[in-house]
Amino acid sequence: YPGVYLFPSFTSNSIDGGGMELINQISKSVERMQLFAEETDALSTSLFSDTYNLAYDQDGRISLPESLIVHANLENKAIFVGQGRKFQIWNPDDFDEFKKKAKIKALEHRNLIGPVELSNEKGMDKD
């Protein structure tokens, strides 16, 4: 599918986005919750009812829906922040403040990063 999925972030005034793989991952996470629990209904409704499936135009651009523009406080500029499996779109001023706080949190929780096993695919030795 030549497009992207976007939805308002739950944790900040930014826009979360990604491809079908992200949507599938979110769906699987919700499916692991109790089927008829109130929390499951609230989460799945909040996630999926506000998700936009947007196609790229002939120049590879998308147009953001007004509700996402308002949620992220976007005006003349936006910043795109890659985050591995997903990305975020921010008002640059809001992102600067978030980034400062994120660095502090990252230092506090750096022990959550587990060891990484290096492969020998590109001539890297494990020893």
Model-derived regions: residue spans:
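Flexible "stalk/tail and boundary" regions
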Residues: 1-53, 58, 67-127
